């Protein structure tokens, strides 16, 4: 339970029972924060990871009344809840907009009304689309599907709430996140999780296309640390001229590997399936900005982790 005297910072995490959110909750607790966890368990994950040392709220981020009640005395908000995978968003673009645009605006408004110190928004590298790589934050958006378009719209709402209302926001564009608790089946499973499940079941790894697609993989523990540093770093605001609040920061490894390389590191029992529309060929982050302004660098390499 949350102490009424609140001797520690209080953070609210949406999507807190999922893959990235639950790892972030663990990290915040390690840093001495109290945590309010919000999740509606709609992601069709293998498992949900509610933490017994937090105050847990089962609710939808589009429900303003329920969300507003969860914001009492909150210092920091980490907004991860989303329609977060490509194929579900392509099949149901209205649902993606409701969750990723309306839900994000509800959270921003609740944060504004509660007077939180800073709001950290989890976004996606897919907003870069077919821009030249490595992707840098100054590139224009090139959204190829409803998922990336709706997440990029959420970024614009964050910037607007900073400029218009003075709410401190930071946008983190994740590249391909991997690590413990990654989903291994269903629409929300990333490629490494799918490959690991297939290997454990004695099945061939299903490689989309020819496996030449390149991905920038970043470990979930590095992502959790990036969130914490983005929320607490004083480096983002010095004065009205040197102000980086409301801006986008890449969270990636700064390197990339082909899907074929990842598959080979897991199992040589492989098969190939047709390419899917709306997917990018390469994700590759330039992480100069987040290193310079927040002091974050990744620590875990995907091929080392897979050994």
Task: Identify the meaning behind each predicted range.
Residues 133, 156-215, 220-232, 264-267:
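NAD(P)-dependent short-chain dehydrogenase/reductase
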Residues 17-20, 61, 105, 131, ...:
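Gly/Ser/Thr-rich beta-alpha loop segments that engage phosphate groups in nucleotides
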Residues 200-307:
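C-terminal substrate-binding subdomain of Rossmann-fold SDR/epimerase-dehydratase oxidoreductases
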Residues 50, 59, 184-188, 244, ...:
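Residue-level signature of the cytosolic catalytic core of signaling kinases
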Residues 85, 124-127, 131, 187, ...:
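Activation loop
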Residues 1-177, 221, 231, 296:
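N-terminal Rossmann-like NAD(P)+-binding domain of SDR-like oxidoreductases, especially those catalyzing
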Residues 14, 98-101, 147, 185, ...:
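Short, solvent-exposed loop/helix junctions and linker helices
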């Amino acid at each position: 339970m949350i102490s009424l005297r609140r001797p520690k910072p209080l953070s609210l995490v949406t999507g807190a029972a999922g893959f990235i959110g639950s790892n972030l909750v663990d990290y915040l607790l390690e840093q001495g924060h109290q945590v309010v966890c919000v999740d509606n368990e709609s992601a069709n994950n293998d498992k949900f990871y509610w933490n017994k040392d937090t105050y847990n709220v089962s609710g939808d981020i589009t429900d303003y009344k329920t969300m507003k009640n969860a914001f009492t005395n909150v210092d920091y908000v980490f907004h991860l809840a989303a329609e977060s995978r490509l194929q579900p968003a392509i099949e149901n673009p209205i649902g993606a907009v409701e969750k990723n645009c309306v839900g994000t605006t509800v959270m921003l408004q609740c944060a504004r009304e509660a007077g939180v110190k800073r709001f950290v928004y989890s976004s996606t590298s897919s907003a870069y689309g077919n821009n030249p790589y490595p992707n840098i934050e100054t590139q224009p958006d090139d959204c190829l599907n409803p998922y990336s378009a709706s997440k990029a719209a959420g970024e614009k709402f964050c910037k607007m709430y900073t400029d218009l209302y003075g709410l401190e926001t930071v946008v983190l564009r994740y590249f391909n996140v991997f690590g413990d608790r990654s989903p291994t089946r269903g629409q929300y499973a990333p490629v490494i999780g799918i490959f690991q499940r297939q290997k454990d079941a004695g099945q061939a790894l299903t490689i989309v296309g020819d496996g030449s697609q390149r991905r920038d993989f970043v470990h979930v523990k590095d992502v959790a640390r990036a969130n914490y540093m983005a929320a607490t770093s004083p480096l983002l605001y010095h004065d009205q001229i040197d102000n980086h609040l409301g801006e986008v920061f890449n969270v990636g490894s700064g390197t990339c590997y082909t899907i074929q390389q990842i598959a080979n590191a897991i199992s040589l029992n492989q098969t190939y399936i047709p390419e899917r529309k709306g997917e990018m060929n390469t994700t590759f982050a330039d992480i100069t900005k987040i290193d310079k302004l927040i002091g974050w660098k990744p620590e875990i390499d995907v091929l080392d982790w897979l050994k």
